[in-house]
Structure formats: structure tokens, C-alpha cells
Amino acid sequence: MKSSSHLKQEALNYRFNSNVPLKLYLTTCISIVEEAQNSARCNNMERAYLLYIRYLDLCLNRLVHHSEVNTSVESLYKREYFQLLKLEVPAIMKITEELKIKIDARYKSLANNVATSTYVRSPAVMTTNPSDEINLPSSFDEQKFNQSISWFNHSSKHFSAQSDSNNEYPELPELNATSTSVTYTMPAL
């Protein structure tokens, strides 16, 4: 789950090229709104919010500086763009605000329910207490202990060498491909 501010950052991360025709950007705007509406219907609020923010940024911040919008020549696409600004943008701004409230509430709820670590890391320097030391019994013979470890290591190597020799598989008979012939006949058409 992402916060609305994180989603907004993602939404604003796209390339805009003012040399692309306005007609193509208007078609893109329609596609973005349709995809956002589909995401909202599927209860994917994060994706819907991201797409609506991208749409608003495209309409309000990027297309305003497009060369076809800034010309004095009236065109169908320029009128369509102003129609978007007048009719669609206010409605989408309202939808976006509602989604932002829902996303932030869900994000806050999840953030409050996330388990936090209570483990406190001990300092890097280890201090030993005399009570923490382990005292070996007086009957402990370190030389015998080392011999036992050595014998165990040697016997395990010997055992693994024996088990490897048991893994040999018998040779498989070879098939002679030249002695077998297969003929194919094509059916008459």
C-alpha cells in the first residue's frame, strides 16, 4: 500500500513531448480516464488515483504549454481541449480528492497495524559477565576431545567416499541408429 503523496510522485513521472500532436494527447487523455474508471470499478483505488492525477497533470500543467494550444488559430482539437478543461477536469478533481481521502485513511490504518520491532540492538562491544562464563568439569580432557573430533571427521570422509562408489550406475546398452530405418509415406491428396 502506498500513500497518496507517493502515488502522486509516480503519476508525475512521465515524459511529455510538445512536438506530439495535440490530437494524440487528447486521445491519450480519454484512454487515461477510461483506464482510471475501470480501475475504480475494480476497487483498485491506488491505480485509479495515479491515473487521475496523471490526467490532471497532463491537462492542467503540460498541455497548457503545447504549441497547438498557444496558437491563435482555432482548431477542433484546441476547442476539444478547452472543453475538457471546462467539463471533465472539475469532475475528475472532485473524484481525485475523494480517492485521496480514502487512500490516506487506508494507508494510515495499515501503518497503525504494522508490527514494529521492539528488539533493541546491543552495543557492538560485548561485555562478559563472570556469571556468563561456562566452566568445564575438571574431568574434561581437551586432548581426548580433539582426538574424537579428528576421528569423527576422518570417518565421515571415509564414509562419504564409500557411498560415492555405490552410486555408480551400470552401463546402458547403446542403440545403433543405423540399423533401424523408418519410412514415411505421404497420403495421396
From Swiss-Prot:
Inhibitor of the DOA4 deubiquitinase involved in the regulation of protein degradation by the proteasome and maintenance of a normal level of free ubiquitin. One of its GO terms (cellular component) is endosome. SUPFAM superfamilies: USP8 N-terminal domain-like. Transmembrane segments: none annotated. One of its GO terms (molecular function) is cysteine-type endopeptidase inhibitor activity. Keywords: Endosome, Protease inhibitor, Thiol protease inhibitor. This is Regulator of free ubiquitin chains 1. It comes from Kluyveromyces lactis (strain ATCC 8585 / CBS 2359 / DSM 70799 / NBRC 1267 / NRRL Y-1140 / WM37) (Yeast). The lineage of its organism: Eukaryota, Fungi, Dikarya, Ascomycota, Saccharomycotina.
